[in-house]
Amino acid sequence: MNNLTGILYIVATPIGNLQDITQRALAIFEQVDLIAAEDTRHSGLLLSHYGIKKPFFALHDHNEQQKAHLLVEKLQQGQHIALISDAGTPLISDPGFHLVRQCRQAGIKVVPIPGACAAVTALCASGIASDRFCFEGFLPAKSKARCDKLQNLAEEERTLIFYESTHRILDTLADIEKTLGAERYVVLAREITKTWETIVGDNVANLRQWLGEDPNRTKGEMVLIIEGKVKQETDEINPQALKALELISQSLPLKKAAAIVAEIYGYKKNALYQYGLEHFN
């Protein structure tokens, strides 16, 4: 790596409460020569709050692939650059991937400056398992594509995290109910760190009803945390054992049939018995 090249700093900014900026982020803003931002007007207002004035470079979804090389050239000339998004951590459902990849390929040092991230902030307050999770960004805008995406994730056991917009939230919850079931537990985190912060959890059917009762509840930036599929013991029982259970239970009491099949196939008889209660007449 050329020591004369500049450094690209990936700097997280607040997601609502301006007090959540870090001292390190402010120090980096003072040091860099240029700030790359999604919306330069929005970011200019943000940084002016902290008394920081720096030149901006607009880098957003519509121009990143064409413009990233210009920033790489500036870095190679020795300029230091901070990359920020409109809110939160850059690259998390925000631009920056192409720039960071090009920098790493060019041997330019990339330094992350951690801070707020809406997905992780919502997850830690959701009460849903956080040891394994899957962040999927925004779901598709069209219902058909959205349902297809959700169907592909229907068997996912990890916690699912999505961002969603205010004008699609009710339709999205309806599609979640249709594809994942009315009883799937969902937490909605709205306006995190802001005045009207709301974090509410319920099964998706109840949550959709609650949101629909007051238009104000569907306003603001939203994160959806969906509990992963809870595997039932019967999910692991092979079809041959279940077929045997069905046949034997036609001539013997279900409890006896479950005991016989459990002995033959090595499954728990209680799991087999429960399956029979739920599926056999």
Curated annotation (Swiss-Prot):
Keyword annotations of the record: Cytoplasm, Methyltransferase, rRNA processing, S-adenosyl-L-methionine, Transferase
Annotated function: Catalyzes the 2'-O-methylation of the ribose of cytidine 1402 (C1402) in 16S rRNA.
EC number: 2.1.1.198
Cited PROSITE patterns: RSMI (PS01296)
Gene name tied to this protein: rsmI
The protein's name: Ribosomal RNA small subunit methyltransferase I
Record's subcellular location: Cytoplasm
Chain segments annotated as coiled-coil in the UniProt record: none
Positions of transmembrane segments: none
Family: Belongs to the methyltransferase superfamily. RsmI family.
InterPro entries: 4pyrrol_Mease (IPR000878), 4pyrrol_Methylase_sf (IPR035996), 4pyrrole_Mease_sub1 (IPR014777), 4pyrrole_Mease_sub2 (IPR014776), rRNA_ssu_MeTfrase_I (IPR008189), RsmI_HTH (IPR053910), SAM_MeTrfase_RsmI_CS (IPR018063)
